[in-house]
């Protein structure tokens, strides 16, 4: 492993990409510490200590939302905009045709940026009224109040757009997926709270509750098992054997070898988790923004409170969204008919199946089975911690989501590094 890192550092292009990625991540974390003007961040601490839906947004921003800093909105506007654009791409034929054009993805990315700016503006206005209702503003009336509102909202929007730009820069000049790495950095930066949780368990054990001495190592073992399980399932794949017919080109005989078509168990990666979390958090976040009083509006309070982590309806909706987004992502990423046509053009075939429709039907059936298993895996890892949290009363609802994101992003980044190493005839991270 250490020799691999040394070899990676000897490749100038890879070294520059690594340094650039690290520099962007450092700038991102610095932006998460720059306070927004005219706001008292200490007044917002209690609002984020209640474990409601704002906790999810705070996790995605690396704690910047609770501190009301430049990057308070995090990557959430970009993610929500991506959901909207991708759903519209499937629903609107013009956008679907645009996606198939040579420069279609660049145009869709531009639409994504504009949509992200609109979502960021809406969220900024909502968050402004939240901090105003919490009494965290230094100016709320007169010309000073208007000026403060404009500066605060503009700062939030600018921060969100800067994060989007930073993610795209990592995509172009760095290593790995930019937005995913920013989410990774946000989640890891919040893991310092694990120390507080551990010391809390030890304190309760020392105070006369010895069962927590047993609970702590059990939780550690479960966490390690969960990490191993996620790594194994993320790397698992179904390999379909491909045979290529022999053909003569000039005086040389080409083809005749066997290969395989890899179908990963978790093809969609962590995106279904991220998208489902972002989507299911919208009603609860709106409820937090509106600060609805239970006595004055009991119906609306009950409706928005339904989308809290402690609600079983939230668990069901979250589960269904993960399943739906997993199938949706696989459907737009893999086209069995196109794969079958490519095999036919290259004189390839799957043993036991004729080229054309029989081949595409077999790939479709195999893909559906794998997608179901992958969707159940994602849903189980994401939902089980929430269920355990509801049953035990412990605040571990973000554990499954954050674990999947961190492990998934780490593996994807490792693969990117490995591909660079392999192309330059060095031994990669993955062997």
Regions found by a protein language model. Name each.
Residues 1-99, 103-431:
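N-terminal cationic and glycine-rich segments that engage phosphates or anionic surfaces
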């Amino acid at each position: 492993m250490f020799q691999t890192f040394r070899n990676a550092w000897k490749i100038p292009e890879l070294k520059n990409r690594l340094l650039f990625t690290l520099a962007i991540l450092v700038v991102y974390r610095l932006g998460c510490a720059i306070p927004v003007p005219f706001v008292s961040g200490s007044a917002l601490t209690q609002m984020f200590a209640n474990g409601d839906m704002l906790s999810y947004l705070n996790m995605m921003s690396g704690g910047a939302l609770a501190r009301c800093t430049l990057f308070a909105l995090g990557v959430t506007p970009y993610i929500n905009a991506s959901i909207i654009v991708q759903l519209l791409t499937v629903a609107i034929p013009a956008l679907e045709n645009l996606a198939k054009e040579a420069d279609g993805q660049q145009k869709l990315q531009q639409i994504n940026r504009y949509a992200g700016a609109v979502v960021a503006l809406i969220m900024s206005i909502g968050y402004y009224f939240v901090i105003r209702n919490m009494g965290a503003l230094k100016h709320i009336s007169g010309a000073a109040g208007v000026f403060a509102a404009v500066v605060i909202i503009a700062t939030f929007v600018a921060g969100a757009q800067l994060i989007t730009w930073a993610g795209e820069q990592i995509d172009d000049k760095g290593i790995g997926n930019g937005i995913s790495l920013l989410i990774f950095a946000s989640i890891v930066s919040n893991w310092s709270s694990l120390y507080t949780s551990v010391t809390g368990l030890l304190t309760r054990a020392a105070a006369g509750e010895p069962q927590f001495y047993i609970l702590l190592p059990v939780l550690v073992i479960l966490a390690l098992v969960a990490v191993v399980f996620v790594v194994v399932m993320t790397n698992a794949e179904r390999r379909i054997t491909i045979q290529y017919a022999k053909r003569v080109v000039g005086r040389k005989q080409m083809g005749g070898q066997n290969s395989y078509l890899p179908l990963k168990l978790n093809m969609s990666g962590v995106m279904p988790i991220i998208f489902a979390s972002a989507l299911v958090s919208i009603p609860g976040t709106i409820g937090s923004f509106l600060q609805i009083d239970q006595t004055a509006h009991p119906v609306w309070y009950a409706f928005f409170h339904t989308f809290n982590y402690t609600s079983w309806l939230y668990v069901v909706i979250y589960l269904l969204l993960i399943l739906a987004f997993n199938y949706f992502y696989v459907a737009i990423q893999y086209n069995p008919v196109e794969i079958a046509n490519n095999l036919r053009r290259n004189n390839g075939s799957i043993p036991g199946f004729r080229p054309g429709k029989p081949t595409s039907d077999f790939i479709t059936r195999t893909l559906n089975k794998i997608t179901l298993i992958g969707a159940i895996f994602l849903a189980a890892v994401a939902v089980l911690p929430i269920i355990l949290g509801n049953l035990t009363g412990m605040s571990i609802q973000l554990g499954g989501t954050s674990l999947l994101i961190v492990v998934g992003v780490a593996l994807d980044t490792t693969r990117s590094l490995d591909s660079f190493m392999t192309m330059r005839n060095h031994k990669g991270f993955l062997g």
